[in-house]
């Protein structure tokens, strides 16, 4: 297990890139729109991990609601696991509250699921199973 990325919710991806890419000098590895989630994302590698910038593209998304309530800032911590199905099953048997009891697959082959902050001491935790070279 390792930290895959730390996600930061932003209202304007381009404005955020002015700081992270142009100011800090972090390279942009990937920019993608995830229609299912209603977000535009950018991954910027930092050592063996990434910063993920997440901008809502619709007002009815979880990220848009989060930004309205909290403003821009850290949204979640993502842990990379080798077998997400086994991890989710193990967490469920321990009574851990899962937002996604089953993994969701992105177009690039990455499978992910979220653990509810109530079970993770206030932190939204995402689990990632990377089956391709994306974001690693």
Locate the predicted segments by residue:
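Short, structured motif recognition centered on aromatic/hydrophobic residues
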Residues: 3, 17-20, 44, 51-54, ...
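Short strand-coil-strand connectors
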Residues: 11, 45-47, 118
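N-terminal beta-strand motif that seeds the catalytic metal site of vicinal oxygen chelate
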Residues: 1-15, 72-81, 133-136
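Short, charged/polar surface micro-motifs in flexible loops or helix N-caps
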Residues: 47-51, 58-60, 84
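Vicinal oxygen chelate
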Residues: 42-43, 79, 88-136
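A cross-kingdom feature marking solvent-exposed beta-strand/loop segments within repeated
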Residues: 2-4, 26-36, 58-75, 94-111, ...
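C-terminal "cap" of GNAT-fold acetyltransferases
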Residues: 34-50
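Amphipathic alpha-helical segments
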Residues: 14-27, 91-94
């Amino acid at each position: 297990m390792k930290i895959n990325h730390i996600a930061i919710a932003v209202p304007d991806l381009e404005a955020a890139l002015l700081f992270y890419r142009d100011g800090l000098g972090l390279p942009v590895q990937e920019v993608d729109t995830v229609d299912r989630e209603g977000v535009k994302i950018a991954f910027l590698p930092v050592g063996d991990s990434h910063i993920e910038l997440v901008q809502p593209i619709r007002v009815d998304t979880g990220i848009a609601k989060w930004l309205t309530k909290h403003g821009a800032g850290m949204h979640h911590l993502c842990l990379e696991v080798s077998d997400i199905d086994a991890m989710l099953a193990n967490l469920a048997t321990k009574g851990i509250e899962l937002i996604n009891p089953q993994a969701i697959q992105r177009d690039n082959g990455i499978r992910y699921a979220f653990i509810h902050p109530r079970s993770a001491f206030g932190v939204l935790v995402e689990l990632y199973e990377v089956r391709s070279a994306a974001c690693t």
